[in-house]
Amino acid sequence: MKYNLPCVNIILRQLTLYPSILGVYNNKQIYRYCMTNKLFVTKRNGSKELIDLEKIHKVIAWAAQDLDNVSVSQVELKSHIQFYDGIKTSDIHETIIKAAADLISEETPDYQYLSARLAIFHLRKKAYGQFEPPKLYPHVVKLVEAGKYDQHLLLDYTADEFEQLESFMDHGRDLNFSYAAVKQLEGKYLVQNRVTGEIYESAQFLYILVAACLFAKYPKETRLDYVKGFYNAISTFKISLPTPIMAGVRTPTRQFSSCVLIECGDSLDSINATSSSIVKYVSQRAGIGINAGRIRALGSTIRNGEAFHTGCIPFYKHFQTAVKSCSQGGVRGGAATLFYPLWHLEVESLLVLKNNRGVEENRVRHLDYGVQFNKLMYQRLIKGQSITLFSPSDVPGLYDAFFEDQEKFEALYVQYEADDSIRKKCIKAIELFTLFAQERASTGRIYLQNVDHCNTHSPFDPTVAPIRQSNLCLEIALPTKPMEDVNDPNGEIALCTLSAFNLGAIKNLDEFDGLADLAVRALDSLLDYQDYPVPAAHTATMGRRTLGIGVINYAYYLAKNGVYYSNGSANNLTHRTFEAIQYYLLKASNQLAIERGACPKFNETRLSQGILPIDTYKKEIDNVTAEPLHLDWESLRASIKKHGVRNSTVSALMPSETSSQISNATNGIEPPRGLISIKASKDGVLKQVVPEYEKLKDNYELLWNIPSNEGYLQLVGIMQKFIDQTISANTNYDPSRFEGGKVPIKQVLKDILTAYKLGIKTMYYHNTRDGADDSLIEAEEDCAGGACKI
C-alpha cells in the first residue's frame, strides 16, 4: 500500500494533539485518508488534477494565525473525510469552511474567526478569481458597465479621486469579521446575481462606496474627508447600517428607508391607495406599518343606508395580500404590523386574528398587530370599570382626539357613552385586557402602543402633527395622513431612515460627538439621494427629514462595565449614555441646520418652541435613577430655537438581529439568550459568540437568567426619557418560574401597567421560554421581519 505523505502528516498531527481520538478512527478510515493520491479535483475551468493537500494545509494555517485554541489538523481531518473523487475546488473550500465553523464552541470560540478567514478567502476567489482584490477605479468601471453599480459614481468622482478613496481602504479589515458576519454579507449585503449566486465585490468595496455615494454632493473641498471618516466608522463597526443601505446604496436601486408608515382612511379610494403604496414599498425592501384604525365596523351603514359595511377583516386580508405579494428586493420577505385602537367596535374579533384557532374566513394570520391604548383605558382597568367599544365612523372627533388631546378624548368618550342613539358595546375592562394579554402571550406578536405617551413625549406638536401609528417593529413614531389615491399630494407616508451606534466599540461618551455628526450627515444625505415611489412619502420626508439612530451591543456594553439588567446597577450608566447619544445627535442636526437650513416643517415640532425630550419625559423615571444631566442642554436649546434642526427626529431603538452579526455585536438593547447563539436563516445555521467571551463570560446576564421584566423595563424607561421616537422593547417570560409552570395573565398585565407608568411608548415581542436549549436555534426573523430591523 502506498501512503500519501501529507495525509499521514495530518493524521500524525491530529493524534499528537488529540491522542484520545486514536480509537475513534478505524483502519478503513485511515486508509481512506491515506489513499487521497487517487482523488482528483475539478478546477473552476473544468480541468482535473490530483488533490494537493499541502496547498489546503497552507490556507488553513494562514487562517489560523494569531488565534487561540484552534487546530489546523482537526479542521483538515474533519474536511478530508468528506472529500471524494472529482470534487470541485469550490466544494473543497465550502467543506473546509463548514468543518471549521462546526468547531465553534464555548471552549474554542476562535474558530469563528478561522472559519471567517477561510470564507473571505473563498469569497474573494469567487468574486475576483484570486485572493487579492482589484483596484477600486477599474472595479467600479467594470460594475457600472455591467449595470451592477450606479453610474453616478463615475459622474461624481474623477479617476484621481478614486485613487484617493482607494488609499483610505483597508482590505485587511475583512479579517476582523466573524463567520456569522461573512455569511450574512454573502447572503444579504454584497452586490450579486441572486439567481446564479455570482458575487461581484468584497466588504471594503461595500463600505467605501456607500460612504462615497452618501457624501457625493458635499463640497469637493471637504467631501473626501467625510467619506474617509464615515468609511472608517462603518468598516470598524462603530456605526452599524441597516439592510436596505448595506445592500442597496451604490446600486441602481434607490430606496433605502427602512420603515414605511401608511395611514388608511375610511373610504375605498383610501384603502386602495394604501394597498398600492404597500406593494410599491414592499418590493423595495421596506417593512410596513399600516394604520387601519379609521375603518368602520362591521354592519355600519354605507351611502345613507344603501348597504351594510363588511367590516375590517376583508380589508385586513386585502392588505395582507399586498404585503405578501413581493419579497423585499430579494433580500427579505414582506412583512407588516397593522394598528387599531382598543376601543374599536370589532376589537374582540380583531384581537384573535393571528391565533391558530378559527377558520380562514375569520383569521388574518400573516400580519402582526399593534393595539393602541391610552390613559383612560388603563384607568378603566385599574378602577374595575368597563370599556365602551365604538365604530370610529359613528363618533365624530373621537378618533382624532385619541391622539391629539387626551382631555378632549375623555370628554367625547363619556359623552358618546351616554348617547343612546349611538351603536356601542360595553365590555369589562379586565375582560378586554385579559383577551389582549392572552393573545399577546399565545402568539408573541400582538404589540402595544401607548398613543398618549407617543404624543405627549414627542418632538412633534400633536395639535398639528399627531402620531397615530408606529411601524413594523414598534420603534418609529411619526406623523401620517391618509391618501385618497396613490398620487394624493395631501397624504403623508412617513419614512424613517435608520442606523445605530455600536456601544461595544465606544471608548468614552465624547466619541458620540464625532460619530453623531457622521451618522446624521450621512443619513440626511440619503434622504435627497433616494427615490420616492409615492408622492406622499416624498412630501413627508422632504418636510420632516426624519432619522432614527439607535444602538447595538448594549448587552456587551453592560458586561464590559460590570453592570446588570436585573438589579438597577445599569440604570445610571444607561442614563449617562443615552443622554450623550441624544444630545450629540440633536447637536449634529442643529449644526446641519445652520449649514443647510432647518427642515421645512420645523415649525410643527415642539423643538421650535424650545421644548426638548428632557422637558416632557415621565417623571416616574426620577424614582429609578437619580443621575443628573451632564451636558449643556440650555445652550443647545437656545441654538435650536435660533437655527432649528435639519431633522425632526434623530433617534429610535430598533431590533438589529441581522446587522449586529456583521459587527459581531449583541442584538440592539436585548440580553443574549446564550453565550453562543445558533441562528437559523436562509443562509444556513450560524454560530455567533458574544464579544470578549473568554474575558466577560461571567459578566453577561443571559435572557432566561433574568428573574423578571422589572429591571429591563426600568432601563427602557430611562432610554425613552431621551429617545425622541420609540423603542422595540420586549417582555420575556419563563413559565418554570411560576406556579404550575404557567405564566399568570396577572403578571403580563402588571408588566404592561409598569411599562405605562415608566413612560414606555411601545411594546414589541412577548417571548415565552419553550424549554429548548437556549443557545440553540434562535430563529432569525428577517425573512418575515421586514426592513425596520437593521
Label the model's feature ranges:
Residues V352, V371-L435:
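Polar, glycine-rich mid-to-C-terminal structural blocks
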Residues E198-F205, L209-D269, L412-E439, T443-L448, ...:
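Gly/Pro-rich turn-and-neighbor structural signature
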Residues V191, E198, F205, V210-R223, ...:
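Function-dense linear segments that define catalytic or interfacial modules
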Residues L5, L12, P19-L22:
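Short hydrophobic targeting helices and cationic amphipathic motifs
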